[in-house]
């Protein structure tokens, strides 16, 4: 007997997760590009590995902020706020200054 999920089961589960999250956040993931273009109009600067680590963690904070903004009119989204706090602490650890 195999308890591992099959590919179709995994895909159905993923679709269910997408639908649940989309009800909460909407299509906010489609806004990230426009927002990042405003923040980085000249593109990203060259970075070493440490810089890319900082950018990667900052991008996680950014993603949670975008998700939180999608729920701002409904009182916010505690999970996104909590996750952003954790990522911000990770970013502080990586900050040189």
What do the PLM-derived regions correspond to, one by one?
Residues 1-97:
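Intrinsically disordered, low-complexity regulatory regions
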């Amino acid at each position: 007997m195999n308890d591992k999920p099959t590919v179709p089961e995994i895909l159905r589960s993923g679709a269910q997760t997408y639908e649940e999250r989309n009800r909460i956040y909407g299509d906010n993931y489609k806004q990230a590009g426009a927002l990042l273009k405003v923040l980085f109009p000249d593109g990203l600067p060259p970075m070493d590995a440490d810089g890319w680590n900082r950018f990667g963690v900052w991008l996680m904070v950014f993603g949670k902020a975008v998700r939180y903004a999608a729920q701002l009119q409904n009182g916010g989204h505690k999970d996104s706020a909590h996750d952003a706090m954790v990522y911000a602490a990770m970013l502080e650890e990586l900050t040189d200054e």
